[in-house]
A protein has these predicted regions:
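Helix-turn-helix
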Residues: 1-24
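Short alpha-helical functional segments enriched in proximate histidine and acidic residues
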Residues: 40, 57, 93
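Amphipathic alpha-helical segments that line or abut small-molecule/effector binding pockets
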Residues: 47-63, 102
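Short, hydrophobic secondary-structure boundary micro-motifs
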Residues: 65-69, 76-77, 120-124
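Amphipathic alpha-helical packing segments from all-alpha helical-bundle domains
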Residues: 74-103, 124-135
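Amphipathic C-terminal alpha-helical segment
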Residues: 105-123
Length: 135
């Protein structure tokens, strides 16, 4: 909380004038991440480009990515339709096949976290792994 307050230029206790608790902050950040991810993917025409956009967004925003994808999601307090909007480009790229969309998202999420955490060997061709997974 202190780091967030410092970045906002306020004292940590002042955060609670705007939000109830840490969970509300995480929900607001997750909502922002979902909005941004959806926007990043929206103009991409195919699965390869969607994967590239997803990866690039996550690598450029690792903290926000982690808040949105590695904690329980407080769906009851997210803005209506935000998850659907974020998923729409992927769902369109797989012709509405929700099972395939979930599998592709799981692959993309796993590859992304492994890359963010430095878990691939130094000589690994991560681009090739993405291409193989999305083909």
């Amino acid at each position: 909380m202190r780091n967030l307050a410092d970045r906002l230029g306020i004292k940590a206790p002042s955060l609670y004038k705007h939000v109830k608790n840490r969970q509300e902050i995480e929900t607001l950040l997750a909502a922002e991440a979902l909005k941004e991810i959806g926007e990043a993917l929206a103009s991409e025409p195919n699965l390869d480009r969607i994967g590239e956009a997803y990866r690039n967004w996550a690598l450029a925003n690792p903290g926000l990515y982690r808040v949105a994808t590695t904690r329980p999601l407080d769906r009851e307090n997210l803005p209506d339709g935000i998850e659907d909007a974020a998923a729409a480009p992927l769902l369109a790229a797989v012709d509405g096949d929700r099972d395939r969309a979930r599998a592709v998202w799981a692959l993309a999420h796993g590859l992304t976290l492994l890359e963010l955490d430095g878990r691939f060997p130094p000589n690994a061709d991560i681009d090739a792994a993405w291409r193989a997974g999305l083909s």
